[in-house]
Curated annotation (Swiss-Prot):
Regions that span the bilayer: 14-34, 51-71, 86-106, 121-141
PANTHER family, sorted: UPF0756 MEMBRANE PROTEIN YEAL
Location of the protein in the cell: Cell membrane
Protein name in the entry: UPF0756 membrane protein YeaL
Residues in coiled coil: none
Family: Belongs to the UPF0756 family.
Aminoacyl-tRNA synthetase as UniProt keyword: no
Main location: membrane
Bilayer topology: Multi-pass membrane protein
Length: 148
């Protein structure tokens, strides 16, 4: 039997490899493996908890330099007195807020996820962009279309 969803996933994985977006490509290949094996019974859990688990792993990666001591406390304290660091803090707050809006939008309008993913891959492939991820893109979309 012909599986259109599998074909779409393979196409997106190919776009990921072509655009040197290995994060997208590997993620899609893992989902393909889950889809074509008995692991497919885990899809309800992945759909419900996957984003939360991913954000936890991302947060661990971001906080690791603080926890390991690579980023000393003096550097953290200094970030509150340097104007460039204050701008970075403000931008970080704004981007985090956008990501929150993005999660809401993706949960309420899941049909936009494919468009966000394709747009991210095309941006990397055609404009030498960086795959910053669909959460921020979804947050920006939510500013235009609303987050309902």
């Amino acid at each position: 039997m012909f599986d259109v969803t599998l074909l779409i996933l393979l196409g997106l994985a190919a776009l990921g490899f072509i655009s040197h977006n290995t994060t997208v490509a590997v993620s899609i290949l893992v989902l393909i493996i889950v889809r074509v094996t008995p692991l497919n019974t885990f899809f309800p859990w992945i759909e419900k908890q996957g984003l939360t688990v991913g954000i936890i792993i991302l947060t661990i990666g971001v906080m690791a330099p603080i926890a390991s001591g690579t980023l000393p406390p003096s550097t953290l304290i200094h970030s509150f007195v340097n104007w460039k660091s204050l701008v970075a803090i403000a931008v970080g707050v704004f981007v985090s807020w956008l990501g929150g809006r993005g999660i809401t939008l993706m949960g309420n309008q899941p049909q936009l996820v494919a468009g966000l993913l394709v747009g991210t891959v095309l941006g990397v492939a055609l404009f030498r962009g960086v795959p910053v991820g669909p959460l921020i893109a979804a947050g920006l979309v939510s500013l235009i279309v609303g987050k309902q």
